Amino acid sequence: MSDSSDRRFDPQVKFKKGERTEMNNETSKTDKKKKLIKNIVHNYSQLEQSIVNQLYMTNDIHGPTAGGAREDIWRQMFEAIVPKKFVIESSVFIIDSKFHKEEYKRGVSQEVDLAIIDETYTPYIFRYGRLKFVPIEAVAAVVECKSKNSDKASLTNWTNQIEYLTTSTEGIARMQHGLVTGGVPAQQKTSPLKIFCGLGSKHDNLDDIFDFVVLAHQKDAKIDEVKMTETKLEIIPSDENTNLSDWHQKLNSPRPAPKRGSEDDEFSKHTLKNYEVYDRDNNNISLLTFNFQLNQLLMIINNPLLLFTPLKKS
């Protein structure tokens, strides 16, 4: 056989000096890449199972009083996947720039179990031990942690109080060309991602009030007579088919709204479904998928905003 392109199919082909070594090296590199990918997938699966087992062990030992311990486990999960520019705080109350006005009935959220915060430029208003008051401009995501049961009515009220918070348009900061005030057109406000974390599967229809629902399943565990079949995390986005342009509109409220038919079309092609990761058996690697999806949305928010106004008299 004379065609060199067919040599790999013919065991009788005589290789020139060095050709076999070169092909072996290429095969070795390919094998190493495959092994590396396999190890990454395996490690994420192991981490996922470890998180689930810790959550159920904590729940078995402490029962419904395990709130603090449970939050610590979820916190460790988020610390493992979000960039170091963010800090993850517990026992947070989120405020906006109008909360001090007597005529303003809103302005402070209910307590947030975990908040993913960019504290680089936006200061805490008040911090005393575990208790923190943080301006809405600094908050990229909020997390509500529950065990096996959840009350949708109270959770809806919890999310609504966060959505009611408004960002200031009077902040002042120095940019390259001098002092500027107010937000940039591409980001007029921030709307934190809302994430629910719980055990089992008996948390119905929460994906219509949360951006992500993260449920921990432990094999053979039984919750409300529903038996879990495997140990894993189930990640449920509010709508995995929402494109990145619509996420930008939802999270940042740009002004004017993006126009279709421009470069925005490129972002319209990408949805959270594009960031799903599967193994060879077509099983979703949930934690790795969540890593990519969450961080893509954090990059769209890209806090901090130049919007925070210190408290002042009206």
Where are these predicted regions, by residue range?
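Intrinsically disordered, low-complexity Ser/Thr/Pro/Gly-rich regulatory segments
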Residues: 2-111, 115-314
